[in-house]
Amino acid sequence: MGLIGYLIYFNTIKSDDFINSPYNTRQDTFADRVVRGKIMSSDGEVLAQTKVSEDGTEERSYPYNNVFAHVVGYDSNGKSGLESEANFQLLSSHEFFLNQIRNEFMGTKNTGDTVVSTLNADLQTTAYNSLGDRRGAVVALEPSTGKILALVSKPDFDPNTISENWDTLVNDETNSSLLNRATMGQYPPGSTFKVVTALDYFRTRGSFNGFSFDCQGSITKENHTIQCYNGKVHGTEDFYTAFANSCNCAFAEIGTELGGASLLKTSEDLLFNKKLPLTSYRKSSFTLNGSSGIPLIMQTAIGQGNTLVSPMHMALITSAIANDGLLMKPYLIDKVTNAGGDTIRTTEPTDYKRLMTSNEAALLGKLMEGVVQNGTASALNGRGYTVAGKTGSAEYDENGSSHSWFIGYSNVDKPDLVVAIIVEGGGTGSEAAVPIAADLFDAYYFD
């Protein structure tokens, strides 16, 4: 390709999908002419950059090491994360046109554009440190825009040494460190699914008023028994109290009244078995239907059974609740600038889909406020901000071991931060996930 033709093609004709394709052989040509651009956090921290030595050798560097491993990704042995999603922008150069011509004649590479992400370095670091050495994932979103503020998955890896450790990482099936658990992990939702069951109940009955259930600590139907946590007897409950108590018996009863077909319809309205507005993800799975038996319906209604969901999907459902029922399309690229700091393009928030009515979202929000004020997430009460949320304990083996879940949002009158957290093998939601949520909310409002 001639010089002028190359510059015209590179600056006007190329498309994101084409240049990001692994089958596009022109990527090597672009890399020959452009020093790969930086990836920055929204608060001005360098997340990825290319260092060029005196002899022209280039080395991709990740100053935060493991902290942004999955979401920023890597640029060798293939690409992942933002390195893949933003490949087009990072290999673009919007230096002054005549400078590009001069650089071409002098054999000097152009400087690639800078991708400014939506990620907040302080919030990401807080999430990373709070999860600690435990397996799991943390997602933080801005519900009114869809900005992804933090995304952590563990076990992780150091992208600075990805090439040296590649074979070990690929073959380590025990840790699966390359797997982004936030978007690709599949977990039983546990009691966080009671948000879905509650929505289906409201759509079927038209109101939570008039509901009453006498919890005796266990419920048996067709020789299948469901117990509340530790067999706790909650006594007489209305709907709000049953939700705040995370009463398995009440919600197992509700599930049998609703039936599999109704729960399937509402679940698919919330994007189970459906495409998600993400670049890389695994579909959440909901298998209940009209022919499902009572025991499976009971299990499914409380978030067990065969249902599997990713932390990001639960964050999206929570985001819709926090945003009057409207899900905004999640995104990671806030803007792209040239080497001189001039803005080339910005991402405007866009509606993705209305998952529920504004009234339904408000009612679910009230249920979730009760969990914090009077229920299983009371540790988040009285911390200088308001929170609505739902804990979950998702059993995953025959020994009754549980993953710890929390989904929720803060500043309930005008929500500005949504979180979804899972700690593998962490026990109850209040034990492991809620303290991480507290760290995130504290960092967001007070740091």
Question: What feature does the model see in each segment?
Answer:
Residues 1-166, 177, 186, 211, ...:
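Periplasmic/cell-envelope proteins involved in peptidoglycan metabolism and beta-lactam response
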Residues 42-43, 144-191, 196-425:
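Beta-lactam-recognizing serine transpeptidase/beta-lactamase-like catalytic domain environment
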